Every structure is written in structure tokens, then in C-alpha cells.
Amino acid sequence: VFMPPVSTNLADHGYVTDDLVDHYRARAKGGVGLIITEVVTVEPTYTYLPGDMCCYDDTFIPGWEKLAAAVHEYGCKIMPQLFHPAYMAFNIPGTPRLIAPSFVGPSYAREAPRPITVDEIHELTHQFGDAAVRMQKAGVDGVEVHAAHAHGMLGGFLTPLYNKRTDEYGGSLDARMRFLLEVIAEIRERCGKDFIIDVRISGDEYTDGGLTLNDMIYVSRRLEKAGVDMIHVSGGTTIKRGSAIPAAGTQQASHAACSREIKKHVNIPVATVGRINEAWISEELIDDVAADICMMGRANLCDAEFCNKAAAGNADDIRPCIGCLRCLNGNMFGNRIYCTVNPDVERDEA
């Protein structure tokens, strides 16, 4: 069981805090095999959430060293999720006009973005590489590149919903994935062959005019050819947030159908995610060859000892996730993470 990104808003102006270290240390002690952190912004101009972590200069490295060491103490691996928010940037006074693949963005964006220029694409590619190098120096085990949910810059370039460009970065699926492939090549060249690169994608955007499962099978094969080590299959978009982060009353293991099909076409590990909130579900998914890895986020928020309890056969002692999305709804407004069934989640200590 791995833990996928779940925003906490526990950072301080982008810097790792003791609260963040305690939060992730508790999950590592609780038996999680690998933690993928919430988004980590790779450049200083735009912020996704005010309490997110950053790594756009070397001053952030000491905090990441402390976080990596805390997680490694319990045999757990850690990978930050590298990200640029594009049209998803938080509304902070003084922030310049939003940039994005095109002039279009989701209806909840604070303004119509301007298209990023080709020179800015090249600069941002280098900034992704810079951030990965800093993370490697800090001792993390790899990075996840976020390209799912029509979300942020790379997800926005990949989807036809928001990429309306007519240059070499728009039009065909090959052109729309060019930016993502250039970022992967930059990280691989600068961090070496032994540094793990994982890419998070939507296996299907479940939206008219969006990316389909067939599209994403093709993208996954291209990612494998580009040297990616793992594919993290989510689904949906932030336009219909419930399609990406399923709530109570929705299907458990909601994106497993996509991960199962993608797994048939690649030879690298495939992870699935999406309301996998009980141990038996993850066991069934692995046995059924729907994925190689199960990502369990909210389950590990509700009970930091989820994995240890499940492994010991004490599933009845696990504090259950009820799918209320309280963890999401508050932090999208800049508030610290909160959980209905685990009110101490922001203060968890190992």
C-alpha cells in the first residue's frame, strides 16, 4: 500500500514544518510503503494552495532533508509530486495574470489565463528539472510528475479540453504530450537512471471532449518508452471534482477499470487509486491484476496505523473513512487539513 498526494496546507510559505514532518512520520510508522506528498510548486510566481510545499530554490532543501529522514526511519520511501498550478493558482493579491496552455480554463479559475509562451515552456521545463535535482540532494527516492485531472500546467497541456494551441505543443495527442515528455527527459538526464520517475494521469477524463481510455493507453506506452518507472492511474477532472475524488455512495476502487486496461499495455508498475478505503479491496485489486500497487490516501488520513492494523488482521480496529470529503473541502479554501473521523489528523505524531 502506497499513500497518494493529499493536500494538508501544513507548510509555511512553502517550507516544510514540524507539523508536516510529524504528519508523514506517523503514516510511515503506520506501515505505508511509499508516500507521495501533496503538490510541490517548482517556480515562485504561482501558488496552488497557500500551505503547499515548494522547491524552487535551495533554501527549501534542509526541510526536505528532515522530512525524508523522518520517513526513511521507518523503512518508508518518499516522493514529492512536482507541479505548476497554471489556471489553478490560488487567488493571492499581487499574483500576475494566470498562465495556462491557452486562453481557456475551468469555470472556477479566477480569471481567463494567457497562453504560456514557448520560451516560458522551455524555462519551466528547466525549473521542473531544477526541483527534481534539489529533491535528489535532499535524499528523497524519486518524484511524481502530476499530469492528471486536466489539472495544472501539464494536465492542462495533455487534455484537449484546455489545450487549444496551434503550435508544436497543441493539436494532436502527440503534440499535446510534448511538454510532459520534455519534462520527463529533463529530469531523467539530470537525475540519472536510478532516480524514480512516476507520472500521475487520468485513465479517462469521463468528460465529453476529454481524454479517453484509448488515448491514455497510448500516452502510457509513450511514457514507458520515455523511461518512466511507474504510472499512477487516477481518473476524471477537476471540472467534475467528484469524478477524480469519489465521495461516499460512489463506487469503491473507482478508477480500477482504467488501471486494469492500461496495465495490459505496459511493462512497468501501474498504481490505482480512488476510494480504496478497506484492506480487502486492495487485496482483491492486486489478485485480480487490476494494478500492481494500491494508493490509499484518505484511509491513511483517518487512521495513521491503517496498514499495520490491516497486516496484523485487526481490520475491525481501523478508524474508517466515510468518504465525506471534509479533508478536501476545507483545504481548497486555504485551511489546514481536517478529518471528520480523525480530528487530530493535523497534529498526528509518531
State each model region's role.
Residues 1-350:
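Flavin-dependent oxidoreductase catalytic cores
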